[in-house]
Amino acid sequence: MHNQAPIQRRKSTRIYVGNVPIGDGAPIAVQSMTNTRTTDVEATVNQIKALERVGADIVRVSVPTMDAAEAFKLIKQQVSVPLVADIHFDYRIALKVAEYGVDCLRINPGNIGNEERIRMVVDCARDKNIPIRIGVNAGSLEKDLQEKYGEPTPQALLESAMRHVDHLDRLNFDQFKVSVKASDVFLAVESYRLLAKQIDQPLHLGITEAGGARSGAVKSAIGLGLLLSEGIGDTLRVSLAADPVEEIKVGFDILKSLRIRARGINFIACPTCSRQEFDVIGTVNALEQRLEDIITPMDVSIIGCVVNGPGEALVSTLGVTGGNKKSGLYEDGVRKDRLDNDDMIAQLESRIRAKASQLDEARRIDVLQVEK
């Protein structure tokens, strides 16, 4: 319900990872990566399905060996979300997973062998309509670039990326996206800015090895937020030393905060003070867990008193303003009811679910009318 101008996205070409469009104005895709042993098919499939349930558009799977490639075949048969195979050093693994229906190959052309082996992988990708992600990382820069620049710099990451881009250009292959990741926020941001000026391919964003759940989320929000606010980025991954499910949640939270892509409820809640009339923190924590299944975009404000509550409620889908024993409930900016403070969680959950159903039905009718 806010009316700020939308962020102007950088123009880029369009590729597809499975059925997911990437670039050229397509919704920014949110992805994660499994951290199970790929050869443990059951565990990997379960984790991929858990990621899909919280909204993952794409999932990357490490395929370091031929045994892992054979496991990948079984995994691919049991999931519906597009899969990216992460491959280094052995070109034969790339050829094998291509046979098994991989949706995207994450490689660096420079580390999978000589020109003939690179050509074999690219020709296979072209024949099977499989895109490639070039993944440059500050932690694995080529030795000559480390010697040339002394340390990872934006110019070093750009030069590395352009080497790999040139490999694919020489082979007339244009179905690829590029990433230039670093664990340092400023290094990553400046590297992406430079790259965005050099090529028009889709860019995959990430602050690599960002840290644990809290610190990693903060670094990613700052780094990715800066780039996204400048219109840079077509897919993203939040890299956390945590459950991969949290990566998807944080990724969508970043996009929601910038009003780029909405999924689920955007909770607005006060940090509380002695003026709060009900347990705001407990209410928000409970509702975030209970309502994770709702994917309908909604703004829900939960404010403990009348200082800021009415103002936030005016621009929320649903809003609660704390009052003595009963709190005001607003819907689309209009006060509609009063809720008992002692039963706030259950009452709000019921109202939010009802509103989500109402919005879903309205969208369904709109779609039917457009189709007519």
Curated annotation (Swiss-Prot):
Keywords of the record: 4Fe-4S, Iron, Iron-sulfur, Isoprene biosynthesis, Metal-binding, Oxidoreductase
Q: What's a Gene Ontology MF term here?
A: 4-hydroxy-3-methylbut-2-en-1-yl diphosphate synthase activity (ferredoxin)
Pathways involved: Isoprenoid biosynthesis; isopentenyl diphosphate biosynthesis via DXP pathway; isopentenyl diphosphate from 1-deoxy-D-xylulose 5-phosphate: step 5/6
* Residues binding [4Fe-4S] cluster: C270, C273, C305, E312
Q: How and how many cofactors are bound, per the record note?
A: Binds 1 [4Fe-4S] cluster.
Catalytic activity line of the entry? (2E)-4-hydroxy-3-methylbut-2-enyl diphosphate + oxidized [flavodoxin] + H2O + 2 H(+) = 2-C-methyl-D-erythritol 2,4-cyclic diphosphate + reduced [flavodoxin]
What family, per the record? Belongs to the IspG family.
Q: What is this protein called?
A: 4-hydroxy-3-methylbut-2-en-1-yl diphosphate synthase (flavodoxin)
Q: Which organism encodes this protein?
A: Salmonella agona (strain SL483)
The gene behind this protein is ispG
